[in-house]
Amino acid sequence: MSTLGSTCFTEEQEALVVKSWSVMKKNSAELGLKLFLKIFEIAPSAQKLFSFLRDSKVPLEENPKLKPHAMSVFVMTCESAAQLRKAGKVTVRESTLKKLGATHYKYGVVNEHFEVTKFALLDTIKEAVPEMWSPEMKNAWTQAYDQLVGAIKSEMKPSSS
């Protein structure tokens, strides 16, 4: 497990994240795809980071590899957020973090990509649970996302394998 400490992720923030994630979980494939479509709408050049999208003539929403990838990213992000306070840190296995860091490094992911993703994630969550959305919920998800990204960035170096 990563040992990056959590900077006061409160019980209230945890409750907001857990409550919204429990509603979104059943639609994670659809919401993950929405997240990535938003990312590519904001930053079309980000598509070049994905080998399976580079030469694809298929519309993004029909790409057979995008939906499973998008769902796994969305689920990992949300599960990590939901467990942040209880665990006291980002709960992605260290081997997974190292792999995520190395992959993001290899493909040239930069801070702006993480910022675009954060904006798209918050927008996706806001649309998924509009009746729950509040400034407090936005702050809770922002803090959880920032901690996950911090953990990934700490591993962004060339792969040792």
UniProtKB/Swiss-Prot annotation:
The cross-references to SUPFAM superfamilies, in alphabetical order and at most eight, read: Globin-like
- What effect does gene inactivation have here? Smaller plants (shoots and roots), reduced number of leaves and nodules, but increased number of small pods containing less seeds. Reduced shoots and roots length and impaired nodulation.
GO MF terms listed in the record are:
heme binding; metal ion binding; oxidoreductase activity; oxygen binding; oxygen carrier activity
Which intervals of the chain form a coiled coil? none
How is this protein induced?
Induced by nitric oxide (NO), after treatment with the NO-releasing compounds S-nitroso-N-acetyl-DL-penicillamine (SNAP) and sodium nitroprusside (SNP); this induction is repressed by the NO scavenger 2-(4-carboxyphenyl)-4,4,5,5-tetramethylimidazoline-1-oxyl-3-oxide(cPTIO). Triggered by ethylene, auxin, cytokinins (CK, an equimolar mixture of kinetin and 6-benzyl-aminopurine), polyamines (PA) and jasmonic acid (JA) in roots, and by abscisic acid (ABA) and ethylene in nodules. Induced by hypoxia and cold stress in seedlings roots.
Annotated phenotype, changing residue 102 to V: Reduced shoots and roots length. Decrease in long infection threads and nodules during rhizobia-legume symbiosis, but increased incipient infection threads. Enhanced transient accumulation of nitric oxide (NO)
GO biological process per UniProt: arbuscular mycorrhizal association; nitric oxide biosynthetic process; nodulation; response to abscisic acid; response to cold; response to cytokinin; response to ethylene; response to hypoxia
Cofactors, names only: heme b
UniProt record similarity statement = Belongs to the plant globin family.
Subunit structure comment from the entry = Homodimer.
Tissues expressed in:
Mainly expressed in root nodules, and, to a lower extent, in leaves, roots, stems, flowers and fruits. Accumulates in mature root nodules.
Q: Which residues participate in heme b binding?
A: 51, 65, 69, 99, 103-104
InterPro entries named among the record's database cross-references: Globin, Globin-like_sf, Globin/Proto, Leghaemoglobin-like, Leghaemoglobin_Fe_BS
**Name of the protein described by the UniProt record:** Anaerobic nitrite reductase Glb1-1
The organism of origin for this protein: Lotus japonicus
Task of the protein: Phytoglobin that reduces nitrite to nitric oxide (NO) under anoxic conditions (e.g. during flooding or in waterlogged soil) and upon root nodulation. Required for general plant development and during nodulation, especially for the onset of symbiosis. Monitors nitric oxide (NO) levels during early phase of the nitrogen-fixing symbiosis and buffers oxygen in functioning nodules. May not function as an oxygen storage or transport protein. Has an unusually high affinity for O(2) through a hexacoordinate heme iron because of a very low dissociation constant.
What does the record give as the reaction this protein catalyses?
Fe(III)-heme b-[protein] + nitric oxide + H2O = Fe(II)-heme b-[protein] + nitrite + 2 H(+)
Give the residue ranges of motif Homodimerization: 41-45, 111-123
Q: Which keywords annotate this record?
A: Heme, Iron, Metal-binding, Oxidoreductase, Oxygen transport, Transport
Q: How is the cofactor bound?
A: Binds 1 heme group per subunit.
Which Gene3D superfamilies does the UniProt record give?
Answer: Globins (1.10.490.10)
Write down the position(s) of the site called Homodimerization. 138
* Enzyme Commission number, as recorded: 1.7.2.-
Q: Domain Globin, which positions?
A: 8-157
